[in-house]
Amino acid sequence: MATLATASGYPYPATSETPDVQRDLKALADYLEAKTATATAFTPTWTASTTNPAIGNGTIAAAWWKVGNLVFFRIKVTAGSTTTFGTGSYTFTLTGLPTPVAGIRQVIPAGIYARGAASTAFQGLLNGSLAMPLYVTTAFTALASTTAAWASGDTFEITGHYMAA
C-alpha cells in the first residue's frame, strides 16, 4: 500500500488507491506493533509526605512506552528485608517520562497493593506534572505507610496511561 501519514504519523491509504480493508488494517497493526514493541525502563522516585521510604534490598521495576500522545507505564515495587516504608502519603514521580497535559487532572486507572491473598486497590492522579500521589479508591484518601502493615515480600503495582503534552 502506498501510504500517506497524518499529523500523528499513522498510516492510511492514498485516496487514489482501491480500498483493501485486510491490507490496510494489517499496515496499521504493523505500524502500531512497531511503535509499542519496545518499552523503555525508568526509575521512578518514591517519596512520602513525612519521611521518605528507602527500597533497600527490595526492587522497583518500571517501564513506559508511547503511542501517539498516550503514555503507558507500569511500576512494580517488591519490598525486601531492608526496605523502609517511610511515613505519610506516598507519591511516585515518573522521572524521565513525557510531561502530562497541563490543566487537566488525569486519574491513573489501576494499582494494587498485595500481601499474600489480601490486596488494596488505589489510584494515582497527575495534574500537569510527573509527580503522582496515590489514593485508596474506596475513600479517595492518601495511600500511606499507615494504610497497611508493610512487610518484606509485599508488592504494589501501578499500571496506567495519561495524555502527554
Name each model feature, range by range.
Residues 9-12, 16, 48, 55, ...:
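Generic preference for well-ordered secondary structure
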Residues 11-13, 32, 43, 47, ...:
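Compositionally biased, intrinsically disordered low-complexity regions enriched in proline and serine
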Residues 37-88:
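Extracellular receptor-binding modules and their adjoining Ser/Thr/Gly/Asp/Asn-rich linkers
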Residues 1-45:
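Extracellular "spike/adhesin" assembly and maturation modules
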